[in-house]
Amino acid sequence: MVSYKDLGLVNTREMFAKAVKGGYAIPAFNFNNMEQLQAIIQASAEEKSPVILQVSKGARNYANQTLLRYMAEGAVQYAKELGWEHPQIVLHLDHGDSFELCKSCVDMGFSSVMIDGSALPYEENIALTKKVVEYAHKYDVTVEDELGVLAGVEDEVAAEESHYTKPEEVIDFATRTGCDSLAISIGTSHGAYKFKPEQCTRDPKTGRLVPPPLAFDVLHEIEKKLPGFPIVLHGSSSVPQEYVDIINQYGGKLPDAVGIPEEQLREAAKSAVCKINIDSDSRLAMTAAVRKVFAEKPSEFDPRKYLGPARDEMKKLYEHKIVDVLGSNGKAE
């Protein structure tokens, strides 16, 4: 048993309470490798922003659970090295699909876990979540759950259609499960193709897809039912078109990739939404930078020469999200 407290990590309880009260959101950045982790810590330390390091089941398998533990501990020490005296860093399991996986993560030093029973019948989702909560809370690990289903494909999470969260269910669900935060569905979705062309309009000047607005009416109803309760948005990458253009320019094929407009995320961050998940954007930043290096320097084969620029581009992206979108800068001095 490894306690996250021994690794220098924190859980989400206090940071979420501050975020809801302060009208900003905590960035939850998914990572798979060292360069992504370095970029996240560099940006967070520079901006003094609390941050959630998210690891999916697939990323955990890719990076290895033992290495992840030491990467997280190293991230805390690296943040201090960069001058962040009191780093507020969470290690979070994203989309845990079983009690066994959540338990394993708690036992290996995660400070927060998500149990995703959203595809289960309502009562089964409650029972599974409650079981995870009871185990995690014994070790002061916080638990996120999802009510409603997001469409799209990202990592090992896939669904054909989204189903909005039903506001009338949230009080019963949160009360009976004891979860610490609730991921809801209001129109976000996973992956770089968050909307089908038929769901969008098309800008006549640029030819780009314009996505439909999020269902803020559903969010506001949920806020009324659960005032002050921490709400989470998944699938909230904006799919920056400059990265899509670079990828396509240098041999990629991402036609009509479209994400969540940042002005809608800014609006969400001012509400009870205190955690916003971002994964695809960093993948796009990394891929765009690597493709550009390979195209401009076809003889290059030193990984540092293409992963270094990728890391730098991701850092710029993370800083932009922290400062210009979520408003979490300066909240973890």
Residue ranges of model-derived segments:
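Alpha/beta enzyme core
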Residues: 10-21, 34-59, 65-86, 95-230, ...
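Short catalytic-loop micro-motif centered on adjacent basic/acidic residues
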Residues: 26-30, 91-92, 114, 231-233, ...
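A C-terminal functional module that forms or caps the active site or interfaces directly
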Residues: 258-259, 273
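Generic N-terminal amphipathic, Lys/Arg-enriched alpha-helix
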Residues: 1-27, 300-301
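A short N-terminal beta->alpha junction/helix N-cap motif
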Residues: 3, 24-32, 59, 305, ...
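Shared catalytic-loop signature of beta/alpha-barrel
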Residues: 53, 60-64, 265, 274-298, ...
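Extended, intrinsically disordered, low-complexity segments
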Residues: 289-333
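Short acidic/histidine-rich active-site segments
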Residues: 235-238, 258, 278-282
